[in-house]
Curated annotation (Swiss-Prot):
It comes from Sulfurovum sp. (strain NBC37-1). Homodimer. Residues 340-546 are annotated as: B. Residues 547-620 are annotated as: C. CDD domains: HATPase_Hsp90-like. SUPFAM superfamilies: ATPase domain of HSP90 chaperone/DNA topoisomerase II/histidine kinase (SSF55874), HSP90 C-terminal domain (SSF110942), Ribosomal protein S5 domain 2-like (SSF54211). This is Chaperone protein HtpG. Residues 1-339 are annotated as: A. The gene is htpG. One of its GO terms (molecular function) is ATP-dependent protein folding chaperone. InterPro entries: HATPase_C_sf (IPR036890), HSP90_C (IPR037196), Hsp90_fam (IPR001404), Hsp90_N (IPR020575), Ribosomal_Su5_D2-typ_SF (IPR020568). It is found in: Cytoplasm. GO terms for cellular component: cytoplasm. Keywords: ATP-binding, Chaperone, Cytoplasm, Nucleotide-binding, Stress response. It comes from the Bacteria.
Length: 620
């Protein structure tokens, strides 16, 4: 019987379970029942699709045994079971668990952290909040040999061959002396009702009870073995909506989400006709921890006629809806459908299309308070959807929210349109990395003066790719204010006249700045600042941000255009400066200060600081 060391991360996790995550100990029952249910789902599928595993009288069940004399609790199932390799992979190493991700996402708040346990697939280890020792006895379906995995949670485990008649898994938990509450029938029943009432398999509680018979001298007390089913064991989504209360939906959500939080909203639909299916979807109040991980765990399980098929198919919903939790149950898909066939299956494509419309419809109907929560958690992935889902782009544009130059908080595009110019039908926006910099940008001055609202898109990494490809929404065209002329009351002739008048000055500044700018020209957008910079919209690279992002490469620098404000006192005086050194310094200050206003850095910060100090000294 060889002893093995737990991998480092699991050793740390065991220590954490034992000493830190003690505020919500009862969840170990939830996690072990959830694992048992998954094992039953897997065997149920095999028994229906593979002749080798057909069993005439098989009926999936989970058993819990309370033994007060032994101070132990046992949870068993007759599911698919595990062999030696499975036990070591699933319980002894990090390979198949989310241990590392779990450790990375710990907050230090014991209650919050205990709710993360199930989300990262490390639920088995929660048993060490209450266990002194654990034995996992398992026999894999179709194999002769059973194995026992044993550990006291201190860093070592051992696996040895044992005898077991039926396939499935039994987890024997020797409880710590101060955890006797989990030997109380009512306490265990309360936990099962709270977290696992709608697990689709019966949960049988085995316990002993003192019974007294007779009276007087014939009075006799004896210990009686009892068994009773303590959950409803119904697939909740198969019940008619009229029979379900909100509490039922919330209770079931807690079962599938491995947490205590209530969902933001849920939607339960049954579709009949040529393609029959039922869906039950939930939108969590808080985004899953792996929302932005490439290896995220999908949150939707696929069933065919109540038989579990998979919980690991990223094709059931589009990637931007990966935060959705729930169930799809089809009446028409074949039971033995392969992963490859799932991707091409017309029935599933129809279910997916219908599901997306229903989910987006439910999001659009959220009240303002819930919409605020949704936006805070999921606005970024909705933008992802705008970029990738052309079919539902218009609906997604109705959901996304942006900051605004005119309003506090986030605004919808419909809000913007309701306040905009219905003749021009234009939606103005500016993109950058810093909200404060964008709000103070000289590029906004003309829009503020004309009382025109501009959307502040400060998630540059995403907005710089998504915004340019939106095109329009409800026939309103998107306009990037850095690439168009600003609102101005001057005629074209007047603008041309001013440009001619200041051409010697703009040429001279360009000569000083050289290749640092592509062009220096008179601005129609500035009302307060002396200068501003913008990227050259005509540059071939300007519209290629998305392509470079997809290739994982940095965007090449786009040449800058420096615009100067002919109405500003500094520009008027600069036109009359004869001192070449002073003119050069002021020209560079015009460029560098404009760059700073847009969150860009001067080419030579030291030289910029020196010029400012020098001019300040002369002014004193």
């Amino acid at each position: 019987m060889a002893k093995h060391q737990f991998q480092t991360e699991i050793g740390q996790l065991l220590k954490l379970m034992t000493h830190s995550l003690y505020s919500n100990k009862e969840i170990f029952i939830r996690e072990l029942i959830s694992n048992a249910s998954d094992a039953l789902d897997k065997f149920n599928y095999l028994s229906l699709t593979d002749e080798k595993f057909k069993e005439e009288n098989w009926s999936g069940k989970i058993s819990i045994k309370l033994d007060k004399d032994d101070n132990s609790l046992t949870i068993g199932d007759n599911g698919i079971g595990m062999n030696e390799e499975d036990l070591m992979d699933n319980l002894g190493t990090i390979a198949k668990s989310g241990t590392k991700a779990f450790m990375e996402n710990l907050t230090g708040d014991a209650k919050k952290d205990s709710n993360l346990i199930g989300q990262f697939g490390v639920g088995f280890y929660s048993v060490f909040m209450v266990a002194e020792k654990v034995d996992v006895i398992s026999k894999k379906a179709g194999e002769e040999q059973a194995y026992m995995f044993s550990t006291d949670g201190t860093g070592e485990y051992e696996v040895k061959p044992v005898t077991k008649d039926e396939h499935g898994t039994v987890i024997y938990i020797k409880l710590k002396e101060d955890e006797k509450e989990f030997l109380d029938k009512w306490r265990v029943q309360e936990v099962v009702k709270k977290y696992s009432n709608h697990i689709a398999y019966p949960i049988i509680l085995n316990y002993t009870e003192e019974e007294t018979t007779g009276e007087g001298d014939e009075k006799e007390t004896k210990t009686v073995q009892k068994s009773e089913q303590i959950n409803e064991a119904t697939a909740l989504w198969t019940l008619p909506k009229s029979e379900l209360k909100e509490e039922d939906y919330i209770e079931f959500y807690k079962t599938i989400s491995h947490g205590d939080d209530e969902p933001l909203t849920y939607l339960h639909n049954k579709v009949e006709g040529a393609n029959e299916f039922t869906t039950l979807f939930y939108i969590p109040k808080k985004a899953p921890m792996d929302l932005y991980r490439a290896d995220y765990q999908p949150g939707v399980k696929l069933y065919v006629k109540r038989v579990f098929i998979t919980d690991d198919d990223k094709e059931l919903l589009p990637p931007y809806l990966r935060f959705v939790r729930g169930i799809i149950d089809s009446e028409d898909l074949p039971l033995n459908v392969s992963r490859e066939l799932l991707q091409e299956n017309r029935i599933l494509a129809n279910i997916k299309q219908n599901s997306v419309k229903k989910i987006l419809g439910a999001i659009k109907k959220l009240d303002s308070e819930k919409m605020e929560i949704f936006t805070e958690q999921y606005n970024r992935v909705i933008k992802e959807g705008i970029y990738t889902d052309h079919t539902n782009k218009e609906t997604l544009l109705g959901i996304v929210r942006y900051k605004s130059s005119s309003e506090e908080g986030m605004v919808s595009l419909d809000d913007y349109i309701s306040r905009g110019d219905s003749e021009k039908k234009e939606i103005y926006y500016i993109v950058g990395a810093d909200e404060k910099v964008l709000r103070n940008s000289p590029l906004l001055e003309a829009y503020k003066k004309a009382n025109i609202e501009v959307l502040i898109m400060d998630d540059e990494e995403v907005d710089s790719i998504v915004a340019p490809m939106i095109g329009s929404y409800k026939e309103w065209t998107f306009k990037d204010i850095t690439t168009i002329d600003a609102p101005d009351s001057k005629t074209e002739e007047e603008k041309e006249e001013i440009s001619k008048e200041f051409k010697p000055l703009t040429d001279k500044i360009k000569e000083v700045l050289g290749d640092e700018v592509k062009e220096v020209k008179i601005s129609t957008r500035l009302t307060e600042s002396p200068s501003c910079v913008l990227k050259d919209a005509s540059d071939p690279m300007a519209g290629m941000a998305a392509m470079f992002a997809q290739m994982g490469q940095e965007m090449p620098e786009i040449p800058l255009i420096l615009e100067i404000n002919p109405e500003h006192e500094m520009i008027k005086k600069l036109d009359k400066v004869e001192d070449e050194s002073l003119f050069n310094d002021l020209s560079w200050i015009l460029l560098d200060s404009a760059k700073l206003s847009e969150g860009l850095e001067p080419k030579d910060k030291g030289a910029f600081a020196h010029r400012v100090a020098s001019l300040a000294t002369k002014a004193l």
